[in-house]
């Protein structure tokens, strides 16, 4: 059946500032941190704190970090997400393929409107978050559900997650093997995932379990025993307790125990971005070097052909 005119895949990533400037970062963070899925503090208290304290401080500070990793084509997250969409058109020639961001541009609602204007009747939404969380995937679903209420004639399927999808697991494992073949193997492999307030997990968010499943499956695909890998959580924000173990202090403790060479991969990130390139590849490496250890960062899958093929398979199965 030819789906050219009526079926589409819309991949959705988190979002990014449009430029590595304080003003652009403030706009982006203002939208991101105003999502009640991300920050659940009552708006009456949160909005003044956000706009009067947090954004004026974090805007310039984060802009300088973005500048370190910005590509000639733009933000790494945006560049790689677009390339994935372009690659998907090769695997899904009878589909329309589009991409959007939950925060910033291209806006999710505008992308949905554009597909409807092209007479699309079925849309598969694929949030590029391998592990489901109420703070990420559910936020995308909120926007999609609101859009569907005013556009009931379009059939929409939203993929929940792909934490244990065999093709995705194989793609991550293959990328690690290629790294080892090119650079040799270190003493310990860390799987570092974006953190989450412990409070959110206590309220039933399955994210930590999904991360554990992904890490265990990738480790099994690499024939690693439990002593050869470790899981950690990064990117903590604020003062409250987040999921543990925290990635960077865990690396420090392992270095102090005598381990000197680490490899680190971030399977919770579909593409490289500020958190992987600046926080991990640059930041973690620097603090470990100060402790006499080395860390090599293994890039995200980005537009790796095996990654693109795995995502295409997810989209096709969503309509079965």
UniProtKB/Swiss-Prot annotation:
Cited SUPFAM superfamilies: Chelatase
Organism, scientific name: Xylella fastidiosa (strain 9a5c)
Entry superkingdom: Bacteria
Name of the featured protein: Ferrochelatase
Keyword rRNA processing belongs to the record: no
Gene3D superfamilies: 3.40.50.1400
Pfam family, one: Ferrochelatase
InterPro entries named among the record's database cross-references: Ferrochelatase, Ferrochelatase_AS, Ferrochelatase_C, Ferrochelatase_N
Annotated HAMAP family: Ferrochelatase
General function of this protein: Catalyzes the ferrous insertion into protoporphyrin IX.
Gene Ontology CC, one term: cytoplasm
GO molecular function, one term: metal ion binding
Cytoplasm among keywords: yes
Binding site for Fe cation: 194, 275
Catalysed conversion reaction: heme b + 2 H(+) = protoporphyrin IX + Fe(2+)
UniProt keyword terms in alphabetical order: Cytoplasm, Heme biosynthesis, Iron, Lyase, Metal-binding, Porphyrin biosynthesis
Enzyme Commission no: 4.98.1.1
PROSITE patterns documented for this protein: FERROCHELATASE (PS00534)
Pathway: Porphyrin-containing compound metabolism; protoheme biosynthesis; protoheme from protoporphyrin-IX: step 1/1
GO biological process, one term: heme biosynthetic process
Subcellular location: Cytoplasm
Family: Belongs to the ferrochelatase family.
């Amino acid at each position: 059946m030819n789906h050219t005119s009526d079926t589409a895949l819309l991949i959705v990533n988190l979002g990014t500032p449009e430029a590595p400037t304080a003003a652009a970062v403030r706009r982006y963070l203002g939208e991101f941190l105003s999502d009640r899925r991300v920050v659940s503090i009552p708006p009456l208290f949160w909005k003044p704190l956000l706009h009067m304290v947090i954004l004026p401080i974090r805007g310039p500070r984060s802009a300088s970090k973005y500048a370190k990793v910005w590509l000639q084509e733009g933000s790494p997250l945006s560049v790689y997400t677009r390339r994935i969409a372009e690659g998907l058109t090769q695997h899904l020639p009878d589909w329309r393929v589009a991409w959007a961001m939950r925060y910033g541009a291209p806006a999710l609602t505008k992308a949905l409107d554009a597909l409807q204007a092209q007479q699309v009747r079925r849309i598969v939404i694929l949030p590029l978050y391998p592990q489901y969380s109420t703070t990420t995937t559910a936020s995308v679903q909120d926007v999609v559900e609101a859009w569907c209420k005013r556009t009931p004639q379009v059939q929409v399927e939203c993929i929940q997650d792909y934490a244990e999808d065999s093709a995705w697991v194989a793609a991550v494992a293959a990328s690690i093997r290629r790294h080892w073949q090119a650079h040799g193997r270190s003493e310990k492999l860390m799987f570092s995932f974006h953190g989450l307030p412990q409070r959110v997990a206590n309220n039933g968010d399955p994210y930590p379990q999904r991360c554990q499943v992904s890490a265990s499956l990738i480790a099994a695909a690499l024939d690693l025993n439990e002593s050869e890998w470790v899981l950690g959580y990064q990117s903590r924000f604020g003062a409250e307790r987040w999921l543990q173990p925290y990635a960077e202090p865990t690396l420090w403790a392992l270095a102090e125990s005598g381990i000197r060479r680490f490899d680190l991969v971030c399977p919770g990130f579909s593409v490289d971005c500020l958190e992987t390139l600046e926080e991990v590849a640059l930041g973690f490496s620097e603090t470990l070097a100060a402790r006499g250890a080395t860390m090599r960062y293994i890039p995200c899958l980005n537009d790796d052909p095996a990654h693109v093929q795995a995502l295409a398979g997810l989209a096709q199965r969503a309509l079965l």
